[in-house]
A protein has these predicted regions:
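Adenine nucleotide-associated cytosolic modules
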Residues: 1-264, 275, 289-292, 297, ...
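Helix-biased "structured C-terminal domain" signature
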Residues: 176-676
């Protein structure tokens, strides 16, 4: 793409619109460097609400400058300039800061509307600010009084003049290309804040339609960075962290507004919040590893995984129909595990009944069993859409099950499938009350996991229990449990976590680090929430959200629900539990196809929805949602559990030798699960 700049034949003429001290100062300063053409900002209201700006056609570029914040005016001016392929620069004042930029260049993504969208998503108080701006729109747009002094206006005007010079003759040096410059009007400190263009931008975005052709997946060789690893390019060092920080993290307009470290816990941790465009919902990426840098990188990459899974960011959904209309072009939603009629009859149940004539939006995925593209319900593939649309439009409760980010498509699919395996194994064990083997902690001697356990037990006084929950696909899965065997007052009785990986040691390490994260906060949470927890013990319907499930089992009153595991008669060493594992492959694609084959061999399909957006591709990431119809989905909230129609719950325990016969529905575990 060529670098756009102010049109050279009109470069000496800059259209200047606006009012107030900022506008007056800029008019005077620019008069000595170029021809300034005053622009009329009076509204000549057309049907689309855009402003009519006389003289724009005679300019090589334009500036809109004012002493307040008027997003409606900014949006209208942006539309007028884009319609004329006219470069322009925004200058305004908001709450103690002057903001310069972004410069909007014709034919290039990244405009003032993109910047505002990123800004809104980055703010933790976006909802409150939106309400204030709506109620006090006139006050927000008015001059900012004492915040903008003559000295401050002179500084900002000088920065604007220099920026216009860059846009005229050296656009590659412009500081406001996909960035905003903020000037603290109290301290006169200048900072630059880069942002990524919004592919969904109504003004400059150009998302392609989601098509059947684009959904085809042809796996390619993916050489591993090391034979013992499972990544094509592991991210772990300071250089990787700094690059990701620069790309994604900015307090003002970043996809990730902050990255915080937690250094007061057993193991390094980090947190990266992320907002959803056109919504006030925020999610979080978190990292819990053995080094600070790795924890920060994990938090950033998990946040970017959330970004891809919450809502489409790479393709525009175009298919809307019923399953009855689509037939074999679509996934049968009844294979995903639905809510039962009993659940639908509950007062206020938020999900609608599914039936084949229900009209849904669909996105294209790829079925490895059918070896062709397959339509998947959009609300199943993107779990954040519930925050932008009424919940009643969804027919199931779904979350980040099977979502993963990878250094290539093959890596992302593998890790998405491993998450499906982890959660399916945990819930199969829970609902079918499988007395899976205990893994002897003493048999871990010499492994990293043994050191993690030693630190947890020494620091907290809890005893760690490990169980092998590997299911019929033979993917190593573990359930770990921290039990307060001393029955200390005000201490949570038990906490659980899970892990899955082709390398069982990594599965165990990941589960233990997740357990350590819980232990850090559990004691205080138990003391503060004791009454609420006891209410959930008495009434499982009070277990409503993810944050309720683990605390329920802090209560010693319900420890007996876990005795089917704690009292299991089966016991193995770590090597006995995971012997016979295939040797390492040099190519990750080989690992992926072997893993997919294990599901296909047990009658389960593997479906992949590519969620990769332009923001992921900038760092050569791939983002996916892996769906395995028939696997038990992790759902939070007792009323939302989804086990209706999942036949594996009844017979897999029998086939694996844990039960003498297949179960019937009345024998399934009726209690809320303890997954964190």
């Amino acid at each position: 793409m060529t670098t756009a700049s102010i049109a050279p034949e009109r470069a000496d003429t800059v259209g200047l619109a606006g009012q107030g001290l900022m506008h007056t100062t800029l008019t005077r300063l620019l008069a000595g460097t170029c021809s300034v053409l005053p622009l009329d900002l009076s509204l000549n209201p057309p049907s689309d609400g855009a402003a009519a700006h006389a003289g724009l056609d005679a300019c090589g570029g334009a500036v809109l400058a004012g002493d307040g914040w008027d997003p409606d005016l900014h949006r209208a001016f942006n539309a007028e300039c884009l319609a004329r392929a006219l470069p322009w620069l925004l200058v305004y004042v908001e709450r103690g800061h002057a903001v310069i930029g972004p410069c909007t260049l014709p034919g290039q993504a990244g405009c003032s509307l993109c910047a505002q969208t990123r800004r809104n998503a980055a703010r933790f108080d976006a909802q409150e600010l939106s309400q204030l701006a709506e109620r006090f729109a006139t006050e927000f747009a008015a001059p900012s009084g004492s915040w903008l002094t003559t000295c401050g206006a002179e500084l900002v005007a000088a920065l604007v003049a220099d920026e216009l010079g860059c846009l005229t003759s050296r656009p590659h040096q412009a500081r406001t290309r996909n960035a905003v410059v903020r000037v603290d009007l109290a301290e006169l400190v200048v900072s630059v804040h880069p942002f990524l263009p919004d592919p969904w931008c109504a003004a400059c975005g150009d998302l392609p339609d989601d098509t059947e052709q684009s959904a085809w997946i042809v796996t390619r060789p993916a050489p591993k960075a090391s034979l013992a690893g499972y990544r094509v390019r592991p991210l772990s060092g300071a250089q990787d962290r700094d690059r990701l920080l620069t790309r994604y993290v900015d307090a003002q307009v970043g996809i990730i507004p902050s990255l915080t470290k937690n250094g007061d816990s057993m193991f390094p941790g980090a947190r990266a919040p992320i907002g959803l465009r056109h919504s006030f919902h925020q999610s979080n990426g978190s990292g819990r590893t053995l080094t600070v840098q790795a924890a920060e990188i994990t938090a950033i990459t998990e946040a970017m995984e959330r970004y891809g899974g919450l809502a489409p960011c790479g393709k525009r959904t175009v298919v809307r129909a019923s399953y009855a209309q689509l037939g074999d072009k679509a996934l049968d939603p009844t294979t995903l595990g639905l809510h039962s009629e009993t659940q639908h009859a509950l007062p206020g149940f938020r999900y609608q009944r599914y039936h084949p004539d229900l009209t849904l939006s669909w996105v294209w995925g790829y079925s490895f069993a059918r070896q062709r593209p397959l339509l998947v319900p959009e609300r199943y593939a993107y779990y954040g859409l519930r925050h932008r649309e009424p919940a009643g439009r969804a027919f199931v409760s779904e979350n980040s099950n099977g979502c993963a980010l990878g250094g290539c498509l093959e890596e992302a699919i593998l890790y998405g499938l491993l998450e499906v395996a982890e959660r399916d194994a945990f819930l199969m064990t829970w609902y079918a009350r499988l007395p899976v083997p205990r893994v002897e902690v003493a048999s871990l001697r010499g492994r990293t996991a043994a050191l993690i356990i030693e630190r947890i037990e020494h620091t907290t006084g809890y005893t760690i229990h490990i169980f092998d929950t590997t299911m019929e696909q033979r993917i190593p899965c573990v359930w770990v449990m921290a039990v307060d065997e001393q029955d200390r007052p005000d201490q949570p009785k038990v906490m659980c976590a899970a892990g899955a990986h082709l390398d069982p040691e990594r599965a165990l390490e990941g589960a233990l680090l997740e357990l350590a994260r819980q232990l850090q906060y559990a004691t205080r949470g138990y003391r503060d929430d004791r009454d609420r927890i006891l209410a959930m013990v008495a009434d499982p319907r009070k277990v409503r959200v993810m944050a309720d499930h683990a605390p329920l089992y802090y209560a010693p009153e319900v420890f007996d629900r876990l005795l089917f595991l704690v009292d299991t008669p089966r016991q193995q060493t770590f090597d006995e539990a995971f012997h016979g594992r295939p040797g390492p492959n040099a190519d990750l694609s080989t690992d992926l196809h072997e893993t997919i084959g294990r599901y296909l061999d047990t009658g389960l399909d593997v479906i992949v929805v590519d969620q990769t957006g332009p923001e992921h591709a900038l760092e050569q990431f791939a983002c996916v949602k892996v769906i395995v119809p028939g696997a038990v989905p992790m759902v939070f909230g007792y009323d939302h559990r989804r086990i209706h129609g999942l036949d594996r719950l009844y017979h897999v325990g029998y086939e694996l030798g844990y039960h003498p016969r297949p179960l019937i529905h009345a024998e399934l575990n009726p209690h809320p699960h303890p997954f964190p």
